[in-house]
Amino acid sequence: GRIDTGNLAYVHELSDIESLNQRALKAELEVTAVSIHAYAYLHERYAMLNSGSSMGDGYGPRIVSLAPRPDYPRAALKGLRVAIPGPLTTAALALQLYQPACETIVMPFDQIQEAAVAGEVDAGLLIHEGQLTYADDGLHLWEDLGAWWLEDTGYPLPLGGNVIRRDLGDEVITQVARDLRASIEYALEHRAPALAHASRFNRGIGEERTDRFVGMYVNQWTVDYGVRGRAAVQLLLDRAADVGVIPARIRVDFVG
């Protein structure tokens, strides 16, 4: 109720990203967050909104293990069982670009850290708060895929974005884009109450880590991709297509 949305009403649904990816594949949702990886399969029905990105600028999904970090983690991952948070997550895509020869085990994102600690898998690919808490459980960082991607390409790693169904039409798309941007700007300008709201969903990591984690992925990149951010999205999907992780190159349409 902080933003004037005119004649549009929004119903907020909270869900994990892989569930949203799967629902978007069925075009169930008019506006939703999705993984950039998933957008390769959604682009005909959905356009990418310019606001709402989660960008890993020198950081991102982390590969962790009970075993200490080897000298050459990329090579060491060959043949190992790695838990991933869903086949259409961008974390899974980045892992395939980093080391396609590992064996991936799909499980809910909030069970991966526990599985790695229990030795049920050789390594886990962590998204969300696990990126900050893995060492508390005695896990070792093998690779930060966002740091690797920046070193490899010079670009941030685009993890997620907001999309809107094309059949809503230009007028509604324009208004939704405006409302979304306004809501993000409002949250950044009123950080304390926004963090208090976010803390309700932080899975027990405490205020300091919540503040840090939110700052990692809700920032000026979230307000607008900008030229560099849009190029980063296109580059990631081009790379994925070129090595056969996604079926073909696509042109990403940004709106708003």
Model-derived regions, located:
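Secondary-structure end/capping motifs
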Residues: 169-239
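A short beta-strand-loop structural module common to alpha/beta enzyme folds
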Residues: 4-19
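Short beta-strand-centered segments that line the small-molecule binding cleft or hinge
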Residues: 20-32, 40-54, 135
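Bilobed "Venus flytrap"/periplasmic-binding protein-like clamshell domains
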Residues: 1-2, 14, 61-123, 129, ...
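Beta->alpha turn/N-cap motifs
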Residues: 16-18, 27-40, 108-109, 126-132
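Pocket-lining segment of extracytoplasmic ligand-binding domains
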Residues: 108-200
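Hydrophobic/proline-rich hinge and linker segments of small-molecule sensing/allosteric domains
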Residues: 48-72, 149-167
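Conserved C-terminal helix/tail region of periplasmic/extracytoplasmic solute-binding proteins
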Residues: 239-256
